[in-house]
Swiss-Prot record:
Protein name in UniProt: Latent-transforming growth factor beta-binding protein 1
Modification comment: Contains hydroxylated asparagine residues.
PROSITE patterns, A to Z: ASX_HYDROXYL, EGF_1, EGF_2, EGF_3, EGF_CA, TB
Classification lineage: Eukaryota, Metazoa, Chordata, Craniata, Vertebrata
Gene name linked to the record: Ltbp1
Signal peptide per UniProt: 1-23
Any one Pfam family match given in the protein's UniProt record, by short name: TB
Lineage: superkingdom: Eukaryota
Amino acid sequence: MAGAWLRWGLLLWAGLLAWSAHGRVRRITYVVRPGPGLPAGALPLAGPPRTFNVALDARYSRSSTAASSRALAGPPAERTRRTSQPGGAALPGLRSPLPPEPARPGGPSRQLHSKAGAQTAVTRFAKHGRQVVRSQVQQDAQSAGGSRLQVQQKQQLQGINVCGGQCCHGWSKPPGSQRCTKPSCVPPCQNGGMCLRPQLCVCKPGSKGKACEITAAQDTMPPAFGGQNPGSSWAPLEQAAKHTSTKKADTLPRVSPVAQMTLTLKPKPSMGLSQQIHPQVAPLSSQNVMIRHGQTQEYLLKPKYFPAPKVVSAEQSTEGSFSLRYGQEQGTAPFQVSNHTGRIKVVFTPSICKVTCTKGNCQNSCQKGNTTTLISENGHAADTLTATNFRVVICHLPCMNGGQCSSRDKCQCPPNFTGKLCQIPVLGASMPKLYQHAQQQGKALGSHVIHSTHTLPLTMTSQQGVKVKFPPNIVNIHVKHPPEASVQIHQVSRIDSPGGQKVKEAQPGQSQVSYQGLPVQKTQTVHSTYSHQQLIPHVYPVAAKTQLGRCFQETIGSQCGKALPGLSKQEDCCGTVGTSWGFNKCQKCPKKQSYHGYTQMMECLQGYKRVNNTFCQDINECQLQGVCPNGECLNTMGSYRCSCKMGFGPDPTFSSCVPDPPVISEEKGPCYRLVSPGRHCMHPLSVHLTKQICCCSVGKAWGPHCEKCPLPGTAAFKEICPGGMGYTVSGVHRRRPIHQHIGKEAVYVKPKNTQPVAKSTHPPPLPAKEEPVEALTSSWEHGPRGAEPEVVTAPPEKEIPSLDQEKTRLEPGQPQLSPGVSTIHLHPQFPVVVEKTSPPVPVEVAPEASTSSASQVIAPTQVTEINECTVNPDICGAGHCINLPVRYTCICYEGYKFSEQLRKCVDIDECAQVRHLCSQGRCENTEGSFLCVCPAGFMASEEGTNCIDVDECLRPDMCRDGRCINTAGAFRCEYCDSGYRMSRRGYCEDIDECLKPSTCPEEQCVNTPGSYQCVPCTEGFRGWNGQCLDVDECLQPKVCTNGSCTNLEGSYMCSCHRGYSPTPDHRHCQDIDECQQGNLCMNGQCRNTDGSFRCTCGQGYQLSAAKDQCEDIDECEHHHLCSHGQCRNTEGSFQCVCNQGYRASVLGDHCEDINECLEDSSVCQGGDCINTAGSYDCTCPDGFQLNDNKGCQDINECAQPGLCGSHGECLNTQGSFHCVCEQGFSISADGRTCEDIDECVNNTVCDSHGFCDNTAGSFRCLCYQGFQAPQDGQGCVDVNECELLSGVCGEAFCENVEGSFLCVCADENQEYSPMTGQCRSRVTEDSGVDRQPREEKKECYYNLNDASLCDNVLAPNVTKQECCCTSGAGWGDNCEIFPCPVQGTAEFTEMCPRGKGLVPAGESSYDTGGENYKDADECLLFGEEICKNGYCLNTQPGYECYCKQGTYYDPVKLQCFDMDECQDPNSCIDGQCVNTEGSYNCFCTHPMVLDASEKRCVQPTESNEQIEETDVYQDLCWEHLSEEYVCSRPLVGKQTTYTECCCLYGEAWGMQCALCPMKDSDDYAQLCNIPVTGRRRPYGRDALVDFSEQYGPETDPYFIQDRFLNSFEELQAEECGILNGCENGRCVRVQEGYTCDCFDGYHLDMAKMTCVDVNECSELNNRMSLCKNAKCINTEGSYKCLCLPGYIPSDKPNYCTPLNSALNLDKESDLE
């Protein structure tokens, strides 16, 4: 997209924003009017929409003029009632600051015209100015009736726009309202215009004028300014109502504060539009307006002035101007373009806060203004238009690095940046005066101005309020205001759709910019580029703001490189130096674009991050680790800069330090534009280039060996192309200054050919010559033009320290620096001041620079420097601080001078020092500069030092068709040409001669500029009084026969009837031969008739309803055709399609049945065939099935799963099957399964030494102790322990007996001791000798049959009786175990005379044989080892181990193990049982479900979903009720009655959340038919603890109220009225009706009112074990115990004893 000139401007038509004396704030509406557009022929600007930055600058200033001082003492003027007068009228409540305007020579007939050429605006200014004078006179006349007016105000209107109790002039009340809110415009607004405020019409696009009476066709647009006329300039509009009288200057009243708002709209160029657009700046009014604010402070409003520059081309540049061209060679003609952006509205509210102190008491008070609106009109605008005290500038420059667009084409840069766009960093350079102009304009006399930024979307709405879909625009609103003031931005919206003009005579990427600034010697044309990257908004990926990741500085393809050390946030990385970011994997940082949605907010610029919706904060890049390697990082606004170490230099962007580059080779070679995937170089250029020029431009490879060029963005690319793509740096530019070291100093030596110059007395040209941003390096420029001027940083009289020797000779005329200061000469216009740390060195003054012939030597001194510049950075004010060995000095900015007394930079008052400055105007001194305020009709000179008259007559559009006479500050039109006359607006307008009927009585009159022409009328018209009237031919007879006639303008047309067509001239109708058309009378004959045709159809066809076709007759509509088939219609006939089993007859008109049994002998083989209508049936015998309806085949029953079971094999036979069972199984009675043979039915199978245990398909013999089963498993045989256990009797003789063995001693006087395993002498009981030491303590072992028996230690340090008389199986130390004697043997009786569980004690209630015994507390003695995973309870004698539900106690391993419930077939009937720890799960196969017992899988029936007969209304049941009585957790899967819900499941019922009674209340017992039981005892390990104080008695119930026991007599089942008559219980009558009293083992189901079985194994087994050493199995109404393996039932109920113990007891009983 080619660049373009853009002319844009807004006129701010505004009153004054002021605070009244009573503290109220008036509402003021500002309308931004457009200026003229471009002439016809200019094309609209294409491309994406532009973004505007809107800046509101509010400034409060104090008056310092003599006139304001005299105004304080003057008498108060009368209050004016006219608030609608722009430019001069004061607000209600404010005194008029303007004196009346004296009469001008020439009388009132003289017309004043604006500078911009907008005729309507000039008249309005003049009229308003006169109204102000008349208003003042009226006020003086009404002052006598002030008292009478005050009485009327009490009874009349109040509020806004009320003057003296009535609506102010220009305001009225809407119907039905008592507020003055309706403005009036006289004359009324035309062409759809809107009366915005009194006498101000807002016109629609295409119209303008005071009353919008001028349309676009009547408006004469001025030609575009540009390079065609160097002497022309775009002047501003003239201020209306010049008040130049000095008669009342001494009587001006006291003034109030005024807010000066400066609105700046800044369109940003888009990426696709390479252009530089420059607005123009026009002067403001020259008058000062003073308004009262309270009674203490006074402010003076000073309108700003900005020079209106000329626009010239490069060829037409003269002295005093120069041009800057982008991408275009010198000599190319400029191009022109205009812009149409539509109307823009800005809504804001100003406010000001102050502190009022009275007698030491201070209070804060804030006054807030009404909502203020600024609107642009008509969509066309000049660059800068002004109104009283307001200025609107449209700025198109994208100022970077914190710069602000001040006016026209100037960026106000911060001190450390310069250049056209503030894109060039600079260290220590003085700021040019014109760059400081905008900043210093914001500083009033002694006032302090602060900035605030608001970012808002630029919304777009049509006039009907419907949103227009355009890409989003974001507006940055910069508000410049004093600290006590603030501005709140509400809305920035575009009212109309944007438009523009296309670019002409330009190439893509080219644009030309011309400037006019201070005088320079010649025109300089340079090439410059700037990056748009900082202007594109960024939309970051959605990520957590606190998430950290790695930051990558290079991204090539999908590879990320140059990762910074440490972690950082995504917004800090992508907003500054990073190109990718991530932790585990990297992702590219998205580009800053925001055109995805209309209302989407744009992100902050590069280098900033968003704090909130309206504020962007600078990112401190120096906090990121790894930034500026080989250097020190210095943070700047929106960026950062690297100060490099010795041996390194900054890259072109000053963002990194690179090693000193080598000298670039000047060797030339071929440059290739393409490299194929196979590394073949293609498309060489016709000339040989250096590698730098090739790779930095269009080349992809270079040299005879096809060396690939480095990729852009890599370090290798930056080394060879430091200026970036498209830029090369010559070898002389790559050389760095010479480094010389003096101690810790690093001083840069100036080259020899650099010529020193004195300090320039005039400011440098603006803008300065710019180099590309990428090409800025620390280098020196050498060339045939000589060295560039050097900017010195200190006065010439200072001394320079030595660079290469101990003494330095000062040459006359050389620039000199202060001691301790040196200069890094990066560029002639960008010096950098660095501080030195070494002490001063001796300096020798040359003879030429000294009056004495002797050299003066300054001895070195050792001092401690205090760097005042670091301690107080603002010590110099408007200047740069330079630290010296003694104190400091200041290098002041232009417009300032150094004050030795104040030690700072003070402003130079140019107005006082320069005489005759600002002639024809008024000079106003500003901070660092001055301002010429020119009156209306004058403009600033090119130098900005004088006011010169604007010759409006030089404009070709002024006084067109007449004579223009220029006057001082104005112009007038006289002597109109022939055919023209003077209009009321003062212009010559054409006379329309055609308005007279007699001008052309028989011809058409055509008006021309200045004349007219009579033209004869064409055919079909006749002339009459200058107009051509149509002739109605339809009135003539015989016109349009066979049709109707329609008269047209100048002709007629025939509309023909059906069957006729018009002739080519549409003046006649002719017959149509329809038969020539091929689509008529198909299947028939066509005959044409007059205006129609006729069809004759053949057999089988009939005429259609439209009579134009022969249609087929559908015979199939008759239902009797084709029975047993389908009738298919054909052309002229039909056919029958018969069903399967039928066939068509010979004639084809019906279907006949096919006898398959006779015609097909292959059907029903092995069976009987029976013919049916349309088919046949086959009947097969048993054991056979039909195969594809062709024959009978055998059924393979063995294919059915589960047939013959898992212990049989199915054998298929013809028509049947047979089961062959395995050994140990026999076929069942139905012959379908194999059943197990119970061999244990024969009692003799295992003889008398064991018992039989049947197994699947076999059996086994479980032998008693001392017996074992043989290899064949038949019976039990004795075990010979003497052979099996070698040495079991030691020295004694082992004798085997049946089931056991005996140890016999050889000496008859000895007996075998099983405790010691030796034979000992027989002793009597009264011998007094202890059989064994009783007090010896060792370890007690259990389960000696375990392989790891050494680890089975019950307890250490116990006696043998404590071990063997309780639960121990062995006793000893270090796994040397002595087995405990078996219970029931003589050894056991000898050791434990009182049996198991009793051990000897000192004192005991058991006293037998003189020894005391006590109960052994096994739980205390052995701890957790005796009852693992369970609860141990000591008993007398013995102990009990209580296991958790679902587990059982193993007395051998002394541990609670999980019970496998799945071994019980009743645990999960017809389902799959899965055992779990302490329980089990029963899974059913779909669609089967668990029944209520959760032990059986059943088929779901509809009865489960139906409401049973005994149920009442069902609803939701809520399982939980919160403390706030909120129902939650509804019961899923079923609805319940109120009783069922409250008694079984939940806490509330129904959609109304009806609460259930408390479970311990009487209502709950009554509802659920249960007695009150109190608190239940807990289950588990604490079940046997005494809780008598906390709980009721064990037996339930413990209390029943009498009202629940009225009558519990038993009734018969038929009398009960309950379903099933209370089975398993008895029916009793209660007060509420009937209920069931269930038998033991059953409980009442309240839902079904039936007695259901109590599962004691699950409900009671958790309190204590119901079955000891057995498994609990629930039965109907009770339960049973099934002994575990190794246990047999005992005589105790629900108790199983070990098998060994039972056998021993049986032997003892047999012996007895």
